[in-house]
């Protein structure tokens, strides 16, 4: 059985009763769907730093860029306790080989963005970041991160999961002997996936790989990884996907019959207009890639960047 990808996650999202009131926030998509392909490494900042359950609820107070973590009723300041624990915990998480993290939204410890921070008048502003989440993201700047709430947006979900699987493939590459040739092969397989996120990074990464002979693998690999993960963070769009589909069609356009060409172009247009999801023209492309035996296209990760069971390309 293929090894599951490991990602960190806020413990309450797995259904564990660790919230301040003794409850949980189980996310069925995470546990029942993603759980088929991912191994979760749970983290509960409040429990792990010794605050227990049940506990008094807390909030962030002060300036959004440097807030304090304070209990609501008794006004006990747990800032130093949380920061000390968080800095130690991220060091421990380095050993877990994580390929991503799913945070609990709006949490004063784990919210990724738009967390309420209360000013001196007690008025909240949604400009904060959870105390643990901030330290985690600063420590692991290239790691894909998301919140449970944002994962209900299908496009954010697809982008996050695509990056998780891409990082795992990168890690598998790095685990082997580093060489320019292996990096070139990796880039070749990911060319169209990168292009689907934008021309700019496609050009920059292509230039870096073209100059690989003049750079030592020790320098080349970190440079490539940073640019690669930065590229995939950019959202794909219908226009970008159409560009990639047309690019792929160009490899076997002359072999297509008139009817085949018309059918393919019609599916492109229907996808462009929002009548059908990406999976439809992509399935047709895959058919012709096999029928007309296109080795370069067969190796493209863009065709299968994540498990088809997740149905991430089934939305119009």
Q: Predicted regions: what is each one?
A:
Residues 2-7:
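Extreme N-terminal starter segment of soluble prokaryotic enzymes
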Residues 10-11, 44, 102-106:
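Short beta-strand segments
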Residues 14-19, 110-111:
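Short glycine-rich His-centered loop
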Residues 17-18, 22, 26-68:
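N-terminal glycine-rich anion-binding loop in soluble enzyme alpha/beta folds
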Residues 59-76, 116-126:
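A charged helix-plus-loop insertion that forms the helical arch/lid used to bind
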Residues 74-95:
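Glycine-rich anion/phosphate-binding loops
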Residues 89, 93-174:
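Internal, conserved structured core segments that host functional sites
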Residues 144-316:
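Acidic, Ser/Pro/Thr-rich low-complexity regulatory regions
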């Amino acid at each position: 059985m293929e090894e599951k990808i490991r990602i960190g996650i806020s413990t309450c999202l797995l259904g564990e009763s660790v919230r301040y009131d003794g409850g949980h926030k189980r996310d069925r998509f995470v546990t029942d769907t993603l759980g088929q392909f991912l191994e979760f490494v749970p983290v509960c900042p409040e429990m792990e730093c010794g605050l227990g359950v049940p506990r008094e609820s807390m909030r962030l107070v002060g300036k959004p860029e440097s807030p304090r973590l304070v209990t609501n009723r008794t006004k006990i300041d747990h800032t130093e306790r949380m920061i000390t624990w968080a800095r130690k915990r991220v060091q421990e998480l380095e050993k877990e080989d994580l390929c991503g993290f799913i945070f609990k939204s709006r949490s004063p410890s784990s919210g990724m963005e738009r967390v309420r921070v209360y000013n001196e008048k007690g008025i909240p502003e949604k400009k904060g970041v959870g105390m643990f989440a901030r330290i985690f993201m600063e420590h692991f700047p290239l790691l894909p991160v998301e919140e449970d709430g944002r994962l209900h947006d299908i496009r954010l979900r697809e982008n996050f999961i695509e990056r998780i699987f891409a990082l795992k493939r990168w890690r598998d590459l790095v685990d082997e002997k580093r060489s320019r040739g292996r990096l070139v092969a990796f880039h070749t397989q990911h060319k169209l996936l990168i292009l689907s996120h934008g021309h700019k990074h496609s050009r920059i990464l292509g230039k870096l790989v073209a100059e690989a002979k003049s750079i030592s693998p020790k320098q080349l690999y970190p440079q490539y990884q940073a640019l690669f993960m930065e590229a995939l963070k950019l959202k794909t769009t219908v226009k970008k996907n159409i560009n990639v589909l047309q690019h792929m069609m160009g490899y076997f356009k002359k072999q297509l019959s008139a009817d085949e060409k018309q059918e393919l172009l019609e599916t492109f247009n229907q996808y462009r207009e929002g009548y059908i999801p990406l999976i439809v023209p992509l399935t047709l492309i895959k058919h012709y890639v096999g029928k007309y035996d296109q080795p370069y296209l067969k190796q493209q990760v863009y065709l299968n960047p994540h498990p088809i069971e997740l149905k991430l390309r089934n939305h119009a």
